[in-house]
Amino acid sequence: MNRIVEKWMYRSRWLFAPVYIGLSLGLLALTIKFFQSMYEILPNIFALSEADLVLRLLSLIDLALVGGLLIMVIFSGYENFITNMEIEGAKDKLSWLGNMDAESLKNKVAASIVAISSIHLLGVFMDLKNIPDNKLLWYVVLHLTFVFSAFVMGYLEKISKRSKRANKANQG
């Protein structure tokens, strides 16, 4: 009975595969939104002020960072929790694929969130005259919370790796 339960539990990981397919559809939606924004920028390029252009470009950078985050989560999550990805033609394979464990993925996600938040905060500061002070304070507090969380996660991973190395040295 125990073996049947274990086999079922192990195979149940495939129930999560549609989530990664859904995230890849989210990547498609993000790509469409990116080109929609480009379509809105290009015809008006000469009418836009420098500040407006920079704000719109920051928005595109935001979309690109979110897209990169999605790709990381889709590939790493699929490979860590579902199955190894057998990509034919090693030239095409991403160098980090298969090398990122759940802990590293969490840290990369946290760093990406900080980068996205930084870009957004830069956009807020460029449009400062239209942002109420109390809202600005919350943007900064939220950003600092992301930065602090990413720092703590990185520090904890460093401690964890150091502890694992010490345990291996003591056993070997």
Curated annotation (Swiss-Prot):
Main localization category: membrane
Pfam family, one: UPF0114
Membrane-spanning residues: 15-35, 57-77, 108-128, 136-156
Membrane topology: Multi-pass membrane protein
Keyword Cell membrane tagged: yes
Keyword Transmembrane helix attached: yes
Superkingdom classification of source: Bacteria
Keywords noted in UniProt: Cell membrane, Membrane, Transmembrane, Transmembrane helix
Localization per Swiss-Prot or TrEMBL: Cell membrane
CC per GO annotation: plasma membrane
Family: Belongs to the UPF0114 family.
Protein name: UPF0114 protein PMI3225
Organism the protein comes from: Proteus mirabilis (strain HI4320)
